[in-house]
Amino acid sequence: MARRSRLRRLLLLLLLPVASTSDAEHRLFERLFEDYNEIIRPVANVSDPVIIQFEVSMSQLVKVDEVNQIMETNLWLKQIWNDYKLKWNPSDYDGAEFMRVPAEKIWKPDIVLYNNAVGDFQVDDKTKALLKYTGEVTWIPPAIFKSSCKIDVTYFPFDYQNCTMKFGSWSYDKAKIDLVLIGSSMNLKDYWESGEWAIIKAPGYKHDIKYNCCEEIYPDITYSLYIRRLPLFYTINLIIPCLLISFLTVLVFYLPSDCGEKVTLCISVLLSLTVFLLVITETIPSTSLVIPLIGEYLLFTMIFVTLSIVITVFVLNVHYRTPTTHTMPAWVKTIFLNLLPRVMFMTRPASNEGNTQRPRPFYSAELSNLNCFSRIESKVCKEGYPCQDGLCGYCHHRRAKISNFSANLTRSSSSESVDAVLSLSALSPEIKEAIQSVKYIAENMKAQNEAKEIQDDWKYVAMVIDRIFLWVFILVCILGTAGLFLQPLMTRDDA
């Protein structure tokens, strides 16, 4: 029992200061708000303004909506003013120098975000305010604002944006409330880094503006938020694939025409770029004022690919030309077979005709054996009796005639030689018919060779055109890409 009694006394001694402090705060609260009116400005003289010290702390840049041109931020609005009705002597209340009270119990300035786009213009007053015995009131309510911001997508995704946030009293003019900026810029000490945007700077400015509606002057504090987009996401997922696809267009002119896939490759590249363009349109603002940089590049690449399709169709038309459908002009031979190949460092393989000896004429090779052939055939004489080793007069006369004629054939042309051979009365009708067939085959093969040479010339002309546009498209692709994506850097240096 004695032990329990001692414990009770000890607990009473420990709780006595707490009860005393709680009682002091209760008495202080009752005294401060006994006759307090939260609607009346806390000034002793009605002509005196309430000086509001104002500062914005950025907690998080939640999102920048380019389509709707809205910037969503999480801010802390620090507001400090003096309320002469909320002063007390700490010694009368157990040394209490600070007191936290609900914000709806005290007078607060009606500071709103002027350029608010969605949601409430004013912050919620459910947080508590800190009171100091000197009458100083500190209120730091958190708020999520969706402010309107004019997004300039000219250099998207390498763009910089300047979004302003204008704070001020909605109903009190400068004679009633005057704003004083704490510091020279937005407080970023507690800022949570964004994965898409980097804040370059956020200076603050105070303005005293006279609006058309009223004669009074209204003060405001405006923060200019300079932000830079982090382009890594768009570079990896949009720009690099577009670059690779656009460079595939160059390979169209290196692809041989005989493979039959040149037009297919062009159309596949065009369809891929169309899909990328549909993706881009969902991420940029729906505005007709400017075309974003990535949109310009896609448009440039689509024109690039469309021209490659037109040129490829023309090249295929040239490639498959034949002597029966087209005649090659002399200027085409001069320019595309002689001049341009040297300029483009193209070397055409030498013809086989210059590297091999001309085959012996038919008459010098095979007709030289007519003597042997005549000996075999002349085993039967004209009279129908067998010849004894070709010693009869008729066979001797026939052999001599063929030998003399074969000697003369070596000095004449092939067609003339064949005609001369056919004129020999010594040859049998079967031999003449065989030689006539050989003559027809030779002339047909000669015509086919000439036609093939002309077709090869047309194919070489198509190859030269392909090589020209290969280098042209490489230069245009490199220069166009560099010219477009270096614009943000050049503009930034000029600024």
UniProtKB/Swiss-Prot annotation:
<feature type="modified residue" description="Phosphoserine">
    <location>
        <position position="406"/>
    </location>
</feature>
<dbReference type="InterPro" id="IPR006029">
    <property type="entry name" value="Neurotrans-gated_channel_TM"/>
</dbReference>
<dbReference type="InterPro" id="IPR006201">
    <property type="entry name" value="Neur_channel"/>
</dbReference>
<feature type="topological domain" description="Extracellular">
    <location>
        <begin position="484"/>
        <end position="495"/>
    </location>
</feature>
<keyword id="KW-0333">Golgi apparatus</keyword>
<dbReference type="GO" id="GO:0007399">
    <property type="term" value="P:nervous system development"/>
</dbReference>
<dbReference type="GO" id="GO:0095500">
    <property type="term" value="P:acetylcholine receptor signaling pathway"/>
</dbReference>
<feature type="modified residue" description="Phosphoserine">
    <location>
        <position position="403"/>
    </location>
</feature>
<keyword id="KW-1015">Disulfide bond</keyword>
<keyword id="KW-0812">Transmembrane</keyword>
<keyword id="KW-0832">Ubl conjugation</keyword>
<keyword id="KW-0915">Sodium</keyword>
<keyword id="KW-0813">Transport</keyword>
<dbReference type="InterPro" id="IPR036719">
    <property type="entry name" value="Neuro-gated_channel_TM_sf"/>
</dbReference>
<dbReference type="GO" id="GO:0045202">
    <property type="term" value="C:synapse"/>
</dbReference>
<feature type="signal peptide">
    <location>
        <begin position="1"/>
        <end position="21"/>
    </location>
</feature>
<dbReference type="GO" id="GO:0005783">
    <property type="term" value="C:endoplasmic reticulum"/>
</dbReference>
<dbReference type="GO" id="GO:0007165">
    <property type="term" value="P:signal transduction"/>
</dbReference>
<dbReference type="InterPro" id="IPR006202">
    <property type="entry name" value="Neur_chan_lig-bd"/>
</dbReference>
<keyword id="KW-1071">Ligand-gated ion channel</keyword>
<keyword id="KW-0770">Synapse</keyword>
<feature type="topological domain" description="Extracellular">
    <location>
        <begin position="22"/>
        <end position="240"/>
    </location>
</feature>
<comment type="subunit">
    <text>Neuronal AChR is composed of two different types of subunits: alpha and beta. CHRNA3/Alpha-3 subunit can be combined to CHRNB2/beta-2 or CHRNB4/beta-4 to give rise to functional receptors. Part of a complex composed of STUB1/CHIP, VCP/p97, CHRNA3, and UBXN2A that modulates the ubiquitination and endoplasmic reticulum-associated degradation (ERAD) of CHRNA3. Within the complex UBXN2A acts as a scaffold protein required for the interaction of CHRNA3 with VCP/p97, this interaction also inhibits CHRNA3 ubiquitination by STUB1/CHIP and subsequently ERAD.</text>
</comment>
<dbReference type="GO" id="GO:0035094">
    <property type="term" value="P:response to nicotine"/>
</dbReference>
<feature type="glycosylation site" description="N-linked (GlcNAc...) asparagine">
    <location>
        <position position="45"/>
    </location>
</feature>
<feature type="binding site">
    <location>
        <position position="261"/>
    </location>
    <ligand>
        <name>Na(+)</name>
    </ligand>
</feature>
<comment type="function">
    <text>Component of neuronal acetylcholine receptors (nAChRs) that function as pentameric, ligand-gated cation channels with high calcium permeability among other activities. nAChRs are excitatory neurotrasnmitter receptors formed by a collection of nAChR subunits known to mediate synaptic transmission in the nervous system and the neuromuscular junction. Each nAchR subunit confers differential attributes to channel properties, including activation, deactivation and desensitization kinetics, pH sensitivity, cation permeability, and binding to allosteric modulators.</text>
</comment>
<dbReference type="InterPro" id="IPR038050">
    <property type="entry name" value="Neuro_actylchol_rec"/>
</dbReference>
<keyword id="KW-0675">Receptor</keyword>
<keyword id="KW-0256">Endoplasmic reticulum</keyword>
<keyword id="KW-0479">Metal-binding</keyword>
<feature type="topological domain" description="Cytoplasmic">
    <location>
        <begin position="317"/>
        <end position="464"/>
    </location>
</feature>
<dbReference type="GO" id="GO:0007271">
    <property type="term" value="P:synaptic transmission, cholinergic"/>
</dbReference>
<keyword id="KW-1133">Transmembrane helix</keyword>
<dbReference type="GO" id="GO:0005886">
    <property type="term" value="C:plasma membrane"/>
</dbReference>
<dbReference type="GO" id="GO:0007274">
    <property type="term" value="P:neuromuscular synaptic transmission"/>
</dbReference>
<dbReference type="GO" id="GO:0051899">
    <property type="term" value="P:membrane depolarization"/>
</dbReference>
<dbReference type="GO" id="GO:0015464">
    <property type="term" value="F:acetylcholine receptor activity"/>
</dbReference>
<dbReference type="InterPro" id="IPR036734">
    <property type="entry name" value="Neur_chan_lig-bd_sf"/>
</dbReference>
<keyword id="KW-0325">Glycoprotein</keyword>
<dbReference type="GO" id="GO:0005794">
    <property type="term" value="C:Golgi apparatus"/>
</dbReference>
<dbReference type="GO" id="GO:0045211">
    <property type="term" value="C:postsynaptic membrane"/>
</dbReference>
